[in-house]
Curated annotation (Swiss-Prot):
Together with its co-chaperonin GroES, plays an essential role in assisting protein folding. The GroEL-GroES system forms a nano-cage that allows encapsulation of the non-native substrate proteins and provides a physical environment optimized to promote and accelerate protein folding. It catalyses: ATP + H2O + a folded polypeptide = ADP + phosphate + an unfolded polypeptide. Keywords: ATP-binding, Chaperone, Cytoplasm, Isomerase, Nucleotide-binding. Forms a cylinder of 14 subunits composed of two heptameric rings stacked back-to-back. Interacts with the co-chaperonin GroES. This is Chaperonin GroEL. The gene is groEL. It comes from Dechloromonas aromatica (strain RCB). Belongs to the chaperonin (HSP60) family. It is found in: Cytoplasm. ATP binds at T30, L31, G32, P33, K51, D87, G88, T89, T90, T91, G415, D495. InterPro entries: Chaperonin_Cpn60_CS, Cpn60/GroEL, Cpn60/GroEL/TCP-1, GroEL-like_apical_dom_sf, GROEL-like_equatorial_sf, TCP-1-like_intermed_sf. The keyword Secreted does not apply.
């Protein structure tokens, strides 16, 4: 086991703060409509240019192990915020840096770190309650477009295309992002269904770039039991092979000999097949298989309907124009089912929704309606170069997450204004002791920081702007894009409530851990020997070769 270096108290925290500052300073230059670009080196190919905070954070690894631990903890703030809300990564990083920086001053002054953390937690709870009170539902296409534009770094084209996609497939529909073939962004809407089951073996993958199995014009076999014996499957496999088309098998499970045979046939190119487990459990699984059957124009092969696998024929199989199977989900695009049958099924499910008593059942039934009636929208991102394409695609994906978050929890005034307004409620809070009061003050100070950073990146004076915004009321704030003051909602500067809430929660959580850190342990760097020939110490004693009687 390698030797370890251990650091305690202030010296440990100082190194950790050093790492936090390096990462946060690199990330926060991207904040706001006038945020700057960061260029990331790639081990092969050209560099990547980005304004996405989490992409910058993920690239940073520091040589000093103690500083790196601090950087990695803040990286976790950005990643977690991105995973949950899809945006707000830079805001979360700025908040975490501010809470740690202010908190460390109080810890150095001898305050109790645990009480500081309790004060921070109290302030965060009060702020979130206030944000939810300010929040208003995001319902119109215009509002969705505004949220998308801001998340995509003030790119109104991206905001509009996402709003159009949501309008066409519904807020519950599936929206995917792909590389386009032209310079302009395009929107394709295809009827389709997605469910959360992926391929049963990675050997089914035929598209290495996307790590997906893509089937063009396939048949769909639906079976409600487990398939282990290949003999049951052979008759239908032979019929599909003769037809010369790929096959998707959806069953309770496919394993053993049956799965092995399908994989071998796929690898050899005899028959392109993919096997996936049926979605859901119990009665819900049966209902979802029936949904897929109606969508694809097939029949579920089940004993209840008097059908068996060995007697199945091609007309029992469903069909689709295209099916994409990833590790964790399957998307059926353009199923061959009759529109009237699909409509009747949707009506039937809507009646069940009205009759359902539990919220869980209602939610699951609504999901099924969305999958049958929603469809799939594909946003094709256009760009002049590959570097621009990657950067733009990342922004579209961020904006898509942000708009979903806005629809889910509503919107608040953007540009850091919501946090400034929430300070009034937090300022009235009182802790159980002086140290907890200091923790509340730490969060109060941090809540100004996103606005300060947006203003600094726009080239204006942060203190002047913060003072003017604080003296205003309601949605009054500073639009860094135009340099004007006014009602942020009317100017279209909006943030999803979920993004602001998640950023603050994650920042406070990790910052609280850092403030209460007293010891850090890291591996000692090994001293590598200098270059050159290795030591040949074992070659001595060869001087007596003269007496060898040559």
């Amino acid at each position: 086991m390698a030797a370890k270096e251990v650091k305690f108290g202030d010296s440990a925290r100082a190194r950790m703060v050093e790492g936090i500052n390096i990462l946060a300073d690199a990330v926060k230059v991207t904040l706001g409509p006038k945020g700057r670009n960061v260029v990331l080196e790639r081990s092969f190919g050209g560099p990547t240019v980005t304004k996405d905070g989490v992409s910058v954070a993920k690239e940073i690894e520091l040589k000093d192990k103690f500083a790196n631990m601090g950087a990695q903890m803040v990286k976790e703030v950005a990643s977690k915020t991105s995973d949950i809300a899809g945006d707000g990564t830079t805001t979360a990083t700025v908040l975490a840096q501010s809470i740690v920086r202010e908190g460390m001053k109080f810890v150095a002054a001898g305050m109790n770190p645990m009480d500081l953390k309790r004060g921070i937690d109290k302030a965060v709870v009060a702020t979130i309650a206030e944000l939810q009170a300010f929040s208003k539902p995001c319902t119109t296409t215009k509002e969705i477009a505004q949220v998308g534009s801001i998340s995509a770094n003030s790119d109104s084209d991206i905001g509009e295309i996402i709003a159009n996609a949501m309008e066409k497939v519904g807020k519950e529909g599936v929206i995917t992002v792909e590389d386009g073939k032209s310079l302009a962004n395009e929107l394709d809407v295809v009827e389709g269904m997605q469910f959360d089951r992926g391929y049963l073996s990675p050997y089914f993958i035929n598209n290495g770039d996307k790590q997906q199995a893509l089937l063009e014009n396939p048949f769909v076999l639906l079976f409600d039991k487990k398939i282990s014996n290949i003999r049951d499957l052979l008759p239908i496999l032979e019929q599909v092979a003769k037809a010369g088309r790929p096959l998707l098998i959806i069953a309770e499970d496919v394993d053993g000999e049956a799965l092995a045979t399908l994989v071998v046939n796929n690898i050899r190119g005899i028959l392109k097949t993919v096997a996936v487990k049926a979605p859901g459990f119990g009665d819900r699984r049966k209902a979802m298989l029936e949904d897929i059957a109606i969508l694809t124009g097939g029949t579920v092969i089940a004993e209840e309907t008097g059908l068996t696998l060995e007697k199945a024929v091609l007309k029992d199989l469903g069909q689709a124009k295209r099916i994409e199977v990833a590790k964790e989900n399957t998307t059926i695009i353009d199923g061959a089912g009759e529109a009237a049958a699909i409509e009747a099924r949707v009506k039937q499910i809507r009646i069940q929704i009205e009759e359902a008593t539990s919220d869980y059942d209602k939610e699951k039934l609504q999901e099924r309606v969305a999958k049958l009636a929603g469809g799939v929208a594909v946003i094709k991102v256009g760009a002049a170069t590959e570097v621009e394409m990657k950067e733009k695609k990342a922004r579209v994906e961020d904006a898509l997450h942000a708009t979903r978050a806005a629809v889910e929890e509503g919107i608040v005034a953007g540009g850091g204004v919501a946090l400034i307004r929430a300070r009034a409620a937090v300022g009235k809070l009182k802790g159980d002791n002086h140290d907890q009061d200091a923790g509340i003050k730490i969060v109060l100070r941090a809540m100004e920081q996103p606005l300060r950073e947006i203003v600094a990146n726009a080239g204006d004076e942060p203190s002047v702007v913060v003072d003017k915004v604080q003296r205003g009321k309601g949605n009054y704030g500073y639009n860094a894009s135009t340099g004007e003051y006014g009602d942020m909602v009317e100017m279209g500067v909006l943030d999803p409530t979920k993004v602001t809430r998640t950023a603050l929660q994650n920042a406070a959580s990790v910052a609280g851990l850092m403030l209460t850190t007293e010891c850090m342990v890291a591996e000692l760097a090994e001293d590598k020997p200098a270059g050159g020939m290795p030591d040949m110490g074992g070659m001595g004693g060869m001087g007596g070769m003269g007496g060898m009687g040559m």
